Amino acid sequence: MIKMKNKRIRNIVTAIALIGASAAASAQTEADPDSLSAWRSVPQTTVSDGHLLGAVSSVEGDALIDPYNTNLANTLFGMVPGLFVSQANGEPGADDASLWGRGVGTFGSGRSLQIVIDGFPSTIDFFNQLSPYEIEKIELLKDAAATAIYGNRAANGVLIVTTKRGTDRPLKIDFGVRCGFQKAIRMPEYLGAYDYASLYNEALANEGKAPLYDKNALEAYRTGSNPLLYPDVDWTSEMMRSLSPVANYHLTARGGSQTVKYFVLFNGVNNTGLFKNPETAAEYGKKYRHSRYNFRTNVDVRLTPRLTAGLIIGGSVEDKYTPGTSESAWNLIDCMSSVPSNAFPVFAAEGMPGGNSMYANPLAELTERGYISYNGRTAQAAIRLTEDLGFITKGLSLSAGINFNSWFRSYSNKTRNYARYEIAKDDSGETVYNMTGEDTALSGDESSSSQWRNLAVEATLAYDRTFGKHHVSAMGRFCFDDSTTSSGSLPYRNLGFAFAVNYTYGGRYMAEFTSGYYGNDNFPPYARYGFFPAGAIGWVISNEEFLRGNGIVNLLKFRASCGLVGNADIGGSRFMYNQYWKYGGSYFFGTSNSGMDTYVEDRLANPDVTWEKDLKVNVGIDVRLLNCLSFSADWFMNRRIDILTKPYDVVPAWLGVSMPDLNIGKVDNTGVELTLGYSGLAADWRWSARGIFSYAHNKVIYNAEAPQEYSYRLGTGHIVDQPFRLEAIGFFRNHEDIDNSPKQIFGDVVPGDIKYRDQNGDGIINQDDFVPVGFTSTPEMNLGLDLGAGWRGFDIRLNFHGAFNRTVYLEGRPYQAFQNNGTVSSFALGRWTPETADTATYPRLALTGNRNNYQSSTFWTRNGNFLKLRNLQFGYTFRDSALKRARIEDIKLYLNVSNVFSLDCMDGWADPECLYGYPAVRIMSLGFNVRF
């Protein structure tokens, strides 16, 4: 124990706030989700899990530290029942994951969870910028009983983030560093010059044209005898490293007394990405790199015996430099995949990039084109006062707070053009260099920026008291927030009131009523507010006399809830209830040459526009046995109505006006969630296992779609965003096969082209033959498995994550050969030829006239299911007397690997989540953590 005076504490905390240090605390703890002694937060009140009636799942912040991720959302894979997480990009600073609560419940534009950070509304952009080291707990509120207090923001679920705060114990300092390397997972393999040229000739032959490359050229490509005139460039290896460094470091201080409690954090991450950073890049701009620094100070002060004040100051500083002309690395990846390996050498001569008028030089795009600078800043400042009103009546308290959030992004463009050179032979056989483009100076601007600011005010009156066998808790809440963006001149405002009351008799029988009354300025003044009620009941059977104290059944609880919540994020334009007019040209009266401006009616107003409404029903059970085995299950059914929809089947097109979107859409969403946990201790051994399963299936009930001649063309009755595609049934074998098959209208077909099924039997393959196929890339099922074990100082942890009932679609250059004069990947090696007609896995090659084969069809779809080992960590913790004498609590050393492997159906072509663009990465890191 370190004992010190208040002045010394203040000095150390001040120093800590100014110091930077480095990553990866290894301690992980996770609150038992079913323990009667565990507590979960509802705004400004606390409810024990034994009395909790809503569907709420949670994860402790320390459990999110192990996976090496700079984006908080990417630490949540398989961690929270009901939370669906999907990542489609591995680029540092652009690797945001998508989050859904209980899947997708609407086909409207607003599908995102409502984010609440420390009791105040926030956004997913803010959430992604948080560091795992500053998180105390993340909770997902799922049913109406848990979310109704958020009113018209609750339909998609609410994600509650609680940051760490101080304690009344002596100062604890936590310092850690982790460094390692990252490598790409499953990048496309593009063919070398010889294979590319051979397949190019084959594609020409399929079109009845003469070959472009003769035998001498093919032999030169094969042997590499003349790399200048017959180059063979692996652009992937020229531009990207097999390994690149990463670093993460953190420093926290936590402690306090009965009077002052504090938590201070600094966390920094650095990533230089997978691109090579040649020294030549320094002349024309920045090398690729991404960094982010998080800071936080949370302080709680007891001003009087009854009054406490809480202060929050937090934020992040993010900087990213991307070579080239785009903020995203996608352009560099696309350029790399567009240039054939035999197009030109990397350099025509020293200091002279190869290139021609058709293709840019990928390496020069990386090193010669300048850079885009991206700078992001987030800030949160909040203060909350809480007064104990026990002098009025026991258990009464009043809390009020104000919060300011700022999210700012700026972009600086510093780009240039460069000369590139094509090698050729003149008539005398001399080597000449034909120049395309010219070298220019760096130029650009710094005028591009975006900003979001939010001011929120909240006040809560809470009551919590026990009268014998009767326990009553209640709260009333007022909240207001005002948001402004750089792209809009008018603010976005929300105002609401909430009320909740919970009654428990004898710790066995429970009833709860929650409600919200919320308004949003996007709706008509006469219909701006809505009432969102919910009710829940529960029975803790384990507290009945016949089960109490039996030693086997520690908890057995049934619960059920039903209620109505809303979603004000409906999309469309603002203030749709207003009628707007637009310029309609000039009208000439009489013989005058001067016309009068006219105005015509724009899209019709919708005076009844309103929010989406979601009727939620939830039934659940929580079980804990022998103080080591826990189980919970939930079944839910949601009916979303009043989804903003284009009224294609309501108003005929010949009406002559643009109709407004109407609140007439309906979607059902049903599913189940299961959680099973086990933990144990024996002598020096300890172990734990926790598995979660989430299933959510949606169905469009009504979307006002236009009538179709064939019912299978309707989206109604299918999942939201149901893909419609042609059904591929093989390849045409010969001309006789073509003549005897339905006519495909997408272009002339020849043997080796994809053959489609005639769904309606009319002898023609056209738009009427597109049918519902598979799922979307958003999974319907999620699986998580967290395994841990330890012996004395050793520990090991594994995190598995699976996603099922998902379909992915392959498109673009990595999968479609010669697309837009691009290159060819190994994906096309199984192409159709007369000799491989029975075993071909890819259509015949062609340079032009390939429109038939690139139709959206089942040929290009793949089963997107996967099971990944997301995280593996092995460590050892030192706790001996020598460390204690040095006032060191413990030191931990550990090895961590993220994205260890994936079991999927992609046959090694690509990662099932990151199909194209910047690849997913595997990170191997070593770290140490010291606690004082």
Regions found by a protein language model. Give the residues of each.
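Short, small/polar-rich motifs associated with maturation and membrane association
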Residues: 1-295, 309, 760
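Extracellular/periplasmic, surface-exposed regions of secreted and cell-surface proteins
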Residues: 25, 298-309, 313-317, 326, ...
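Outer-membrane beta-barrel proteins
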Residues: 62, 124-166, 186-190, 230-250, ...
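C-terminal extracellular loops and terminal segments
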Residues: 79, 659-668, 707-726, 772-784, ...
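Short, solvent-exposed loop/turn motifs
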Residues: 121-122, 353, 357, 431, ...
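Conserved small-residue
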Residues: 174-227, 325-326, 681-777, 817
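Extracytoplasmic gating/loop element in the C-terminal half of outer-membrane beta-barrel translocons
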Residues: 212, 339-348, 803-893, 897
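Glycine-rich, aromatic-lined ligand/substrate-binding cores of catalytic
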Residues: 776-809
